[in-house]
Amino acid sequence: MLDILLPILIFSALALAAIGAVRRIRLWRQGRPSPVPVLRGLAAVPRRYLVDLHHVVARDKVMSNTHVATAGGFVAAMGLAIVVHGLGLAEGVLGWLLLAASATMFAGSLFVARRRRNPPARLSKGPWMRLPKSLMAFSLGIFVVTLPAVGVLPADAGGWLVALVLAAVVAWGLAELVFGMTWGGPMKHAFAGALHLAFHRRPARFSDKRGGEGRSTGLKALDLDDADAPLGVEKPADFTWNQLLGFDACVQCGRCEAVCPAFAAGQPLNPKKLVQDMVVGMVGGSDARYAGSPYPGKPVGEHAGDPHGPIVAREGTALVDAETLWSCTTCRACVEECPMMIEHVDAIVDMRRHLTLEEGATPGKGAEVIDNLIATDNPGGFDPGGRLNWAADLDLPLMADVERAEVLLWLGDGVFDMRNQRTLRALIKVLRAADVDFAVLGNEERDSGDVARRLGDEATFQSLARRNIDTLSRYRFESIVTCDPHSFHVLKNEYGALYPQGQDADYPVWHHSTFINQLIESGRLPLAPGQAQRVTYHDPCYLGRYNGEYEAPRAVLRALGMELVEMQRSGYRSRCCGGGGGAPITDVPGKQRIPDMRMGDVRETQAEQVVVGCPQCTAMLEGVVPPAGNEATAVKDIAEMVAAALDNTPPATPASHDTAASQATEEVLS
């Protein structure tokens, strides 16, 4: 009897899944075009799954092993079940392989069931709570019905009643895991996730065959000359089709929710919920069906679902509140933690672009900052002719005078800030101590455009960027060095797309911590370690998660003889200071302030100082008032730490200095 029922069940489930797949693909194709290399993408799926996806999953060893057993067992068991029971080819080892695959899957499902007994708050509930039962039903059912195929049990064991029961168990598993995979069930992520890996919007994120780490973090430029292209995203169809596919790949594990600084601060942003809102906006349904945790203080509702209907509005009457979008600091912690490699920040900035460019709805001081950038080329509205007033006593060489230098020192967006001027003075002292041939643009330098772009004003960003590019192209230099990770990021990763056709950004861009470390390692900047201090280092988001630089600042601190103690959240899991993405400008209230939480992390280390490498981090962390009875922890830029150490370093002899400088020049410029 099972010989008749099992092929019917298996091929019926596959047929219904195929119908659901076509329906789902049609929904994704409502999005804007996005060319992808189809065959190359499909061929890359195994490597992207086994290397890149599991690189994230493996951070939790237990869940990594569980996922390998459950997912690997299911794929193998389903494929073998089609051959053994669907096609009736049970000869040889195929039946035994199916037993092994289903047993492996069952073992993995036991761990899934254990995790679902007391799930952490970040895990979605609803249909996901029945997933362990479905996994166990399918794996156990397939295991038992395969025993007669390999001769362990007689073909008619148990009679027709047992056969019907086993067929019902297998049907339950097939309905949830195969049919439900393309009809919005908990296994939807398996179908959408595989295609998402193949047709990812950022294929450069994936590691290459040589083992190199992939990284693609620059925002995509809007084509402002295309009159038919939407200025940002108002409705699901305004996303590219593979962005919609990516949202559908969400496994609702809540890792993004757990690391989001805005969510932790009680602001109305939950990145997991936001991704599910994109799905709900496309296909409809109740938010509660898709997500376990709503936004802080936001009701859970229903949406009819329409790819061409608005999902964001300035007054918060649509599915996504404007306040949700403006709460994001663009720290990229959610993207870094996502095992499905979904691009939350891209989606948020896309919707911000609509609010800013189409509706002029930038909250807080956003409109004032953008007006200042347009009128004065700086966010504070200061006289652009006064960019170097603070450095009148430093006699800084100007590129307009020298036309050529080893290093172009990019002063950055905080050049008018008195606190940041102290950092710049320290960096200039370090460069001169290392005998670096550098020059500055002076009044020719404009704001990098970072804050305009993060606030959604792509037009102002592109205007600033193109004028800066025109200025840079007039001079000769070996590299750009800056102490601002935000300027560093846009210069390195976002300006390249705006260069005129036929021109390239043919210069490296260094964060000052990396450049200082190069100088130390090459012997160009000899340091005598001073008195050891207990310090902790705060990783700037735009240096660490955006650009993968974690080691150089720590190497500099070790060279200074510092006792470095790490915060619990450091490196790629560093907590944001709250200063990125224009968040201090839009100023969406929450239950607590993000920088207060970060300084709480600092106090737990009992460090004497917290070392930073970003002017925004400095401003945010220094603005924290310590709790009663606690002394304020000093906040120092890494350039200030090195400059202070220079006061304790005896000068090198002229001969040895010249030799070291010559060798270092060759190394830095090679």
UniProtKB/Swiss-Prot annotation:
GO CC field: plasma membrane
Pfam families: CCG (PF02754), DUF3483 (PF11982), Fer4_9 (PF13187)
Top-level EC class: oxidoreductase
Cofactor: how bound: Binds 2 [4Fe-4S] cluster per subunit.
Cofactor(s) listed: [4Fe-4S] cluster
Source taxon at top rank: Bacteria
Residue span of region Disordered: 648-670
Transmembrane segments: 2-22, 68-90, 94-113, 135-155, 159-179
Keyword Transmembrane helix: yes
Disulphide-bridged cysteine pairs: none
Gene3D superfamilies xrefs: Alpha-helical ferredoxin (1.10.1060.10)
SUPFAM superfamilies assigned to the protein according to its UniProt record, in alphabetical order: alpha-helical ferredoxin
Keywords: 4Fe-4S, Cell inner membrane, Cell membrane, Iron, Iron-sulfur, Membrane, Metal-binding, Oxidoreductase, Repeat, Transmembrane, Transmembrane helix
Chain positions recorded as [4Fe-4S] cluster 1 binding sites: 250, 253, 256, 338
A molecular function (GO) term: metal ion binding
Residues at which [4Fe-4S] cluster 2 binds: 260, 328, 331, 334
Annotated function: Participates in the electron transfer process during N,N-dimethylglycine (DMG) degradation to sarcosine. Probably transfers the electrons from N,N-dimethylglycine/sarcosine dehydrogenase (DMGDH) to the electron transfer flavoprotein (ETF) EtfA-EtfB.
UniProt protein name: Probable membrane-anchored ferredoxin csal_0991
